[in-house]
Amino acid sequence: MTEATQTARTLSGKVVSNKMDKSIVVLVERQVKHPLYGKYMKRSTKIHAHDESNQCNIGDTVTIQETRPVSKTKSWALVEVTERAAKV
């Protein structure tokens, strides 16, 4: 028997919340073509992700990867912080 190897999905987005311990909420935007008019529209999804070391801040651009479920709502984990938000 040969097993098919699956590669975990990765997405990138912006952190919109880090108030939970070891958790972040990432806003992932994508473009979808309207079925009738053909115009491209922005659609967004909020994904809860696991941040083991609490290293993310609001506004950071991050890369997340799909993993096994960590809790009821978290099945994604932080891979890296791509870009830090500007400190005000």
Swiss-Prot record:
Gene3D superfamilies: Nucleic acid-binding proteins. GO terms for molecular function: rRNA binding; structural constituent of ribosome. Pfam families: Ribosomal_S17. Coiled coil: none annotated. GO terms for cellular component: cytosolic small ribosomal subunit. SUPFAM superfamilies: Nucleic acid-binding proteins. Keywords: Ribonucleoprotein, Ribosomal protein, RNA-binding, rRNA-binding. One of its GO terms (biological process) is translation. It comes from the Bacteria. The keyword NAD does not apply. InterPro entries: NA-bd_OB-fold, Ribosomal_uS17, Ribosomal_uS17_bact/chlr, Ribosomal_uS17_CS. Part of the 30S ribosomal subunit. One of the primary rRNA binding proteins, it binds specifically to the 5'-end of 16S ribosomal RNA. Belongs to the universal ribosomal protein uS17 family. This is Small ribosomal subunit protein uS17. It comes from Marinobacter nauticus (strain ATCC 700491 / DSM 11845 / VT8) (Marinobacter aquaeolei).
